[in-house]
Amino acid sequence: MTVIGIDDTDSRNRGMCTTYLATRIATAIEHAGGTVERRLLIRLNPAVEHKTRGNAAIALHTDIDPTDAVEISTQFIDSLAISDDPNTSPGVVITDTCTPHSVADSVIDFCWDAIREFHTIADTVDLIEQVGYHHQGWDGGRGRIGALAAVGAWAALTEWTIEHIAYRQFNRCGTDRDVDEKSVFEAAKRQYPAVWDTVDREEDDAVCVPNAPGPILYGIRGDDVAAVKTVAAEIDSEPVERSSTFITNQGTDIHLRPGTIGSLRDNRAYRVTGTVITDPETRPGGHVFVTLGKRETTEEDHIEETSSKESAVLTDTHHLRTKSSNPDITDQNVSSTITCVAFEPTKRFRQWVRKLRVGDIITVCGEVSNGTLKLEKFAIRSLTRTTKTAPICPGCNRTMKSAGRNQGYRCRDCGTSSSTQSEKSLDRVLSLKWYEVPPCARRHIAQPLIRGDFDAPIMPER
């Protein structure tokens, strides 16, 4: 079988989409008498600096002759890839020396590092040539990094979801999309939760319809092929020129790794448990910040930190071997605290962050950037139920005042003194559950709570 990996053919500002280009290649393969058994959409490390938009690479598994695969792929990249954007650097990797299940261990490890770490183009080319794959790059060919990762993905990963993408007539790119949102909401409601992140009901937003320029009309995500296709069929819209169904690692949390405060590194994503040590603070722009401190870890903490999908991933020996391919990219944050932030675009998620209190123990998930963890979801492990307050005078029922540093409290009316504070019960809205950002703010690779397999009750957003 021939495997074609493609990446970095689009542009943040000028449109195109690697999934569209791959779909055109797949159609050409079929017209040439070949078949495409599988189409993979692989989301890579979302913190990578050199990315176009969603940092996705594509792999096509086909029975076409590799020589024909090279000719067809290069033809479409030459004609459709964005060539006038200095940040676009297409690449293709093609192999027929193995099946998608039996790529070299070094390529499997490479895929894991591309999802959680970083690669250089020099190291990538060295590995491609070691394993004997065909490769070609345009404008530096940085896309060969994602292309090689996509080639290794089927052997590396075990959890998959589905995305069915509908494409517009190509001459309509750059114009407003004509999609009847009422039909989107109704179709999404009927197939939820097998289909998720189609709409954001609270924000009244059809999140499956992109705003960026390019050929995608809408993308329907879920866990069931029939369900996502049913939703797509029930959407009223402008003409759909073509469509493609991808198997993908979207919505799986595969980018997260267990971490501990004091050993987190920038531009990686973690699942880490800590104690809230500051009250939440809303800063200009509506962003909400809260700081976590270290706590003594126990075996139970380890179980918590490997919750969600990590327990399944730990069974993969290739994942256990994964390490940074370039450890000098960024320094480790050795601070005993980590600042977490819920940015304004996370909307109603911020209400939960604002309800945290000093002493709460939580597990947070997100990417670390400039020493700050950008919250994607969090779980309450323990809640502070009381707070310390100045004592009430037993004689006159008034609140005592401080008598001075380390001198306790004194009632200014009757002179009664006390050396200790009182405890006041807190009425907590939060409970021992997982909380998440809404669909309108969810990054492609992050797992919606509704997909399940979490270690505590969930508060899914829809």
From Swiss-Prot:
GO MF annotations in UniProt: ATP binding; ligase activity, forming carbon-nitrogen bonds
One of the GO BP terms on file: tRNA wobble cytosine modification
Location within or outside the cell: Cytoplasm
Keyword Transport attached: no
EC number: 6.3.4.22
Entry-linked Pfam families: TiaS_FLD, TiaS_TCKD, Zn_ribbon_TiaS
Superkingdom in the source lineage: Archaea
The family this protein is said to belong to: Belongs to the TiaS family.
The name this protein goes by in its record: tRNA(Ile2) 2-agmatinylcytidine synthetase TiaS
